[in-house]
């Protein structure tokens, strides 16, 4: 997890640009990031979603703002969603997003979430019930295949 990243391999140039862009969130954790995340694919919470959308499997490159997905934050992604509801009404649809103010994750079914949790934790699996999520949403810019999760 590195604030402001979206699935690209974190090299020195990208890290330096993120330190300049986010001096507190990235610069304040520079040593940890260099020791743990340098030369690995990194993403923040919404970057995990954007990175998959922007990834071009043919070229194996991340193309910013491609496939109709703009460069927006977690709260704007929630605001832009046309299909959403309170977390207690979440349908069992794989790939829905779960949201709380300032943070977003991906529902993978059966009460489980994948989320980019924080710089020192990274990307984790978590329990839907334990995350403090307030709402679910269909991620704008993604077409869903309505298939229910299986055990």
Whereabouts are the PLM-identified features?
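N-terminal capping segments
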Residues: 1-61, 101-103, 114-116
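Aromatic- and glycine-rich peptidoglycan recognition patches
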Residues: 40, 58-91, 101-151
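Loop/turn positions that initiate beta-strands
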Residues: 93-96
